[in-house]
């Protein structure tokens, strides 16, 4: 299998993830439970999309940095730092735009500092620098240490208590950044600072899988390696959840293992479908691949555009008008909400498809 084919299957998984992120982020009103995040302990399908993206980023880090032989040259480090800063800045821009569009253009008193792109930025920067300066044979031991340290923080610091006054994760964020710069819809900011510890372990597991994909010679060997790692992570996450429950809000160690395992298994299945049995594809499956490939090759651009577009359409009242039009046809609220979310996914697909046809791939 060529490098291009290998990346194609990864692009498909990235596209599935980004389309999923847009879908679950843009329901309207009352939604199906599976399209919403777990309130605290537990996990829904919605809770898979962000961790899948971090896992994919880990694989991409390895496949990207291997081109420079992991040499810590000035140009490579400069590119990592630049990308980290830009990702963080774009995340802040989205949060600022949500306030600015309602008139608070120069008011930063309530600007949320941490969100999805900010966490992606920190994890990308840390893991990329790790890849340049640390022996890769220590990747799994590093993951174990990070998860063990984070587990100790959760257990000793009341991390599973949904009360900001005692939860160590909430307290650190409150003391460092203040309540006005944090997420207000839960006791703990789901992208808070300490949660970055387990998120880095998450990306490192993806990095390790990227190493396996690169080092195995045949497609069959790559698939088997991913299946083994995926199965071990799922089993480990399940067993660990008895003492440390699955929890997306605090990015618990069991949640890391479970979601990384599921992502590895899905990547293995996609490699089977795309790289082993591609000759057996039908017109429908080819169209499906193209649909997700559109999202996969411009993942960052389409995620950012979807966030900005959702804010803009909400401000202009377009979102409400479209939803009301849908609701007149589809009476049940949950189904109307799903229909609106699907409409919004297709709207962003249209933007992505224009870029795709013109071979415009926006990268940082």
Regions found by a protein language model. Give the residues of each.
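Alpha-helical transmembrane segments and their immediate juxtamembrane cytosolic regions
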Residues: 1-364
């Amino acid at each position: 299998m060529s490098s291009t084919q290998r990346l194609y299957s990864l692009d498909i998984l990235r596209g599935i993830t980004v389309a999923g992120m847009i879908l679950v982020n843009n329901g309207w009103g009352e939604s199906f439970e599976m399209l919403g995040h777990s309130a605290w302990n537990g996990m829904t399908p919605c809770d898979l999309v962000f961790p899948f993206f971090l896992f994919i980023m880990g694989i991409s880090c390895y496949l990207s940095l291997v081109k420079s032989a992991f040499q810590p040259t000035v140009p490579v480090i400069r590119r990592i730092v630049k990308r980290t800063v830009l990702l963080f800045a774009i995340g802040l821009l989205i949060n600022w735009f949500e306030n600015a569009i309602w008139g608070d253009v120069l008011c930063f008193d309530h600007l949320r500092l941490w969100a999805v792109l900010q966490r992606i930025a920190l994890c990308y920067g840390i893991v990329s620098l790790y890849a340049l300066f640390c022996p890769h044979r220590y990747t799994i031991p590093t993951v174990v240490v990070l998860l063990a340290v984070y587990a100790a923080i959760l257990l000793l610091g009341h991390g599973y208590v949904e009360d900001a006054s005692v939860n160590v994760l909430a307290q650190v964020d409150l003391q460092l950044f203040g309540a006005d710069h944090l997420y207000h819809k839960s006791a703990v900011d789901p992208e808070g600072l300490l949660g970055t510890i387990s998120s880095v372990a998450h990306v490192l597991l993806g990095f390790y899988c990227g190493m396996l994909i690169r080092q195995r010679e045949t497609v069959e060997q790559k698939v088997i390696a991913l299946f083994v790692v995926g199965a071990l992570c799922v089993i480990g996450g399940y067993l660990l959840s008895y003492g440390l429950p699955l929890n997306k809000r605090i990015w618990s160690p069991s949640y890391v293992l479970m979601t990384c395992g599921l992502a590895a298994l899905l990547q293995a299945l996609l490699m089977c479908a795309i790289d082993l049995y591609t000759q057996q594809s039908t017109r429908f499956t080819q169209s499906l691949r193209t649909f997700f490939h559109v999202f996969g090759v411009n993942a960052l651009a389409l995620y950012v555009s979807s966030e900005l577009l959702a804010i803009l359409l909400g401000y202009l009242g377009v979102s409400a008008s479209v939803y009301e039009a849908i609701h007149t046809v589809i009476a049940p609220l949950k189904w109307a909400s799903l229909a609106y979310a699907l409409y919004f996914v297709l709207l962003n697909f249209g933007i992505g498809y224009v870029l795709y046809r013109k071979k415009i791939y926006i990268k940082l």
